[in-house]
């Protein structure tokens, strides 16, 4: 909308709007926002001192983590869908050009891929939350992640940094210096390591 107001003679296309919005979500907004939700979900029992009581019920620690991950997935994908719908509505209100079923499907696909991959990458954020049992370190950690993602954006190194690799994968903008497999491996390795660290730490930690 701002671009259209500044350059009224330059048409704004839906494809660019979907792509730019998803870029902002993946690199700038998504990680801190989902980090806050993650921190709340996994730190709430610590903050309210109810985790020990919760674990007295026949619920394993792994089951507790899985249930919270399912809830987190629902939150992330729901917010991603809302962002896609709002982008479409703003485009219709602003009378952007180039709307077609192909553009809608491609935009929806990019949003969903970005949301799903960001969900996978919350595992290190969960570990930081459990480690410090406080919201502040988690928020700082996610802000640092976003800053690094923005710093490497547009360079070939964005294909290697897990959180910026999400955008590379979702948009299909791979770099000739690094095959697509590098981006997938970066995301997968970070996810697995973060999840493993979370499970091992949560199983061994003493609950007071």
UniProtKB/Swiss-Prot annotation:
Topology in membrane: Multi-pass membrane protein
Highest taxon of source: Bacteria
GO annotation terms (biological process): response to antibiotic
Membrane spanning stretches: 23-43, 70-90, 111-131, 135-155, 159-179, 182-202
Gene Ontology CC: plasma membrane
Location, primary (coarse class): membrane
Record's keyword annotation contains Magnesium: no
Compartments where located: Cell membrane
Keyword rRNA processing attributed: no
Pfam families per UniProt: ABC2_membrane_4
Keyword line: Antibiotic resistance, Cell membrane, Membrane, Transmembrane, Transmembrane helix, Transport
Role of this protein: Part of the binding-protein-dependent transport system for bacitracin that confer resistance to this antibiotic; probably responsible for the translocation of the substrate across the membrane.
Record protein name field: Bacitracin transport permease protein BCRB
Species whose genome carries this gene: Bacillus licheniformis
Designated gene of the protein: bcrB
